[in-house]
Amino acid sequence: MAKQPSDVNSECDREGGQLQPAERPPQLRPGAPTSLQTESQGNPDGEGDRCPHGSPQGPLAPPASPGPFATRSPLFIFVRRSSLLSRSSSGYFSFDTDRSPAPMSCDKSTQTPSPPCQAFNHYLSAMASIRQSQEEPEDLRPEIRIAQELRRIGDEFNETYTRRAFANDYREAEDHPQMVILQLLRFIFRLVWRRH
């Protein structure tokens, strides 16, 4: 049975201007429906391997009516140029037909999820696992609250201690670096003494 000219044109448009031979399996992404593989097989009747470029639609025009399986495929978004514009047989655009865009969700019972759908599902599961790991069990919550309170008390003590050191007298603040130097010298002296 010979193919209709519109089928040849749509296959030409999908394959970039050339039909694939029947011996070679088509190059489809993993997980594509098998119905697409049988639809995009080569030309079994031996008609020419080139598309008719003299057609009114031209070699790069969108197909007039895609097959029933092409609209379900995630690759259909690359075949169709606009969901609002359609070409009639004369090659002019018309707004008469109502074409709704293909649904973006994946049907879990008939096909594997598309890569964007897989990435989104992975993101959701990763966010859920992060939330679960951030929630502490009931046993650790009192200890964490006590640790936070101790840290707050320590921060307040450090803040008040540094204020007192600089507020009392500037001489004491000036003597402070000398004490640090004396302690450093004492530490060095102990290291040297232990080595001998």
Curated annotation (Swiss-Prot):
Motif (BH3): 146-160
GO molecular function, one term: protein kinase binding
Gene Ontology CC entries for this record: Bcl-2 family protein complex; cytoplasm; cytosol; intracellular membrane-bounded organelle; membrane; mitochondrion
Entry superkingdom: Eukaryota
Protein's UniProt keywords contain Membrane: yes
Residues bearing PTM Phosphoserine: 65, 73, 83, 90
Entry's transmembrane regions: none
Entry's free-text remark on domains: The BH3 motif is required for the interaction with Bcl-2 proteins and cytotoxicity.
Identification of the protein by name: Bcl-2-like protein 11
Species of the source: Rattus norvegicus
Gene: Bcl2l11
